[in-house]
């Protein structure tokens, strides 16, 4: 698959041949769903349990007589209706640490990249060489017509000037190639890859 390469000022920089094993496979909704669900579950923090009736440190003895007192019938003081009693149907401790096969994760990333290539929302640029000026970068991004939400993926590290210029731009996120993931790719309207990012992703996913 051949894709045109451009610069941030919209000038032509030739073309690049994308590996079909990484950018040309047929996306499957079930695989993408599994990977995104796994990612979001991994982000969740463990929950702390509340003390229910059996967890409260109080006597289990019936504290009043059943009949003749003129009051409602009660058992012990651990009941949820009393101050200091256990919580009714309280939260239980949960640890979110799902597992997903590495091959499925890699397949999901290839499918996410292929999905962007298939829909024409994958853009390859030469490099992220810009001045560290937010105003200039915002004008360039707007002139390129990338859409409201853009994910830019660079090579080993993100260009420092680009990172500074883009830090205050709403809807523009930047990642190094090692941080590319299914959730962020699908969440954005346009995926922008540098030549270095393409090389890194193909080396990572074509093994």
Curated annotation (Swiss-Prot):
The protein, known as: Large ribosomal subunit protein uL4
SUPFAM superfamilies per the UniProt record, alphabetical: Ribosomal protein L4
Gene Ontology annotations of biological process type: translation
Family to which the UniProt record says this protein belongs: Belongs to the universal ribosomal protein uL4 family.
Function: One of the primary rRNA binding proteins, this protein initially binds near the 5'-end of the 23S rRNA. It is important during the early stages of 50S assembly. It makes multiple contacts with different domains of the 23S rRNA in the assembled 50S subunit and ribosome. Forms part of the polypeptide exit tunnel.
Positions of the UniProt region annotated as Disordered: 44-82
Pfam families: Ribosomal_L4
Quaternary structure note: Part of the 50S ribosomal subunit.
Record keywords, A-Z: Ribonucleoprotein, Ribosomal protein, RNA-binding, rRNA-binding
Biased amino acid composition, Basic and acidic residues: 44-58
Organism in which the protein naturally occurs: Zymomonas mobilis subsp. mobilis (strain ATCC 31821 / ZM4 / CP4)
Record bears the keyword Ion transport: no
GO cellular component, one term: ribosome
InterPro entries listed in its UniProt record: Ribosomal_uL4, Ribosomal_uL4-like, Ribosomal_uL4_dom_sf
Molecular-function GO terms, alphabetical: rRNA binding; structural constituent of ribosome
Entries under NCBIfam families matching the protein: rplD_bact
Top-level taxon of the source organism: Bacteria
């Amino acid at each position: 698959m051949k894709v045109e390469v451009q610069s941030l000022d919209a000038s032509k920089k030739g073309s690049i041949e994308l590996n079909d094993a990484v950018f040309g496979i047929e996306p499957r909704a079930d695989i993408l769903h599994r990977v995104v669900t796994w990612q979001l579950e991994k982000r969740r923090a463990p929950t702390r349990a509340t003390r229910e009736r059996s967890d409260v440190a109080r006597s289990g003895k019936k504290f009043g007589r059943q009949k003749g007192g003129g009051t409602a019938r009660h058992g012990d003081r651990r009941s949820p209706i009393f101050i200091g009693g256990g919580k009714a149907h309280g939260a239980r401790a949960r640890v979110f640490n799902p597992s997903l096969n590495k091959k499925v994760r890699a397949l999901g990333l290839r499918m996410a990249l292929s999905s962007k290539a298939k829909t024409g929302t994958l853009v390859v640029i030469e490099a992220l060489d810009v001045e560290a000026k937010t105003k200039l970068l915002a004008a360039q991004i707007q002139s390129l017509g990338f859409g409201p939400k853009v994910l830019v993926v660079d090579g080993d590290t993100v260009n420092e000037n680009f990172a500074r210029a883009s830090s205050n731009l709403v809807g523009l996120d930047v990642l190094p190639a090692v941080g590319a993931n299914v959730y962020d790719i699908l969440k954005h309207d346009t995926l922008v890859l540098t030549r270095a990012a393409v090389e890194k992703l193909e080396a990572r996913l074509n093994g």
